[in-house]
Amino acid sequence: MADDDPAYVRARVPDYADYADEASRHHTDLVLRTFVGEHLNDARQRVGDELDERTSKTLDELILHCQFTDQAFIHWLDHARLDPPLVASLVAIDRRLVELAERVKDANASDLHDLLEAIDIAFEHRREPLPA
């Protein structure tokens, strides 16, 4: 994690509190998903008619993902002992999600698919510490 990851995310996502504070973990997840989802929804409105079927489907799936809590991730968060390196790892992934969402804001239809795949991968990376 870069030392500025938490500050970077907090500057763009109101009420982001990282995951070190057990009481705010759910809220942190919610505000992050809301931020990403709003950018995705804006892209849907801006270039939705220009998207191919595959990209449109991926966009819709990611918007839906942002609307609902990932139950496995939240359950893990509720019971995890997050040491500083693990918190740093999660915040770095969140920064990546924020950066990608900001790129979506200005992406044209032809660039959107690769960004959406990167967002999907970043969300999956948040789940990597979960026990198998």
Predicted regions and their residues:
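Charged linear interaction tracts used for macromolecular binding and regulation
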Residues: 45-129
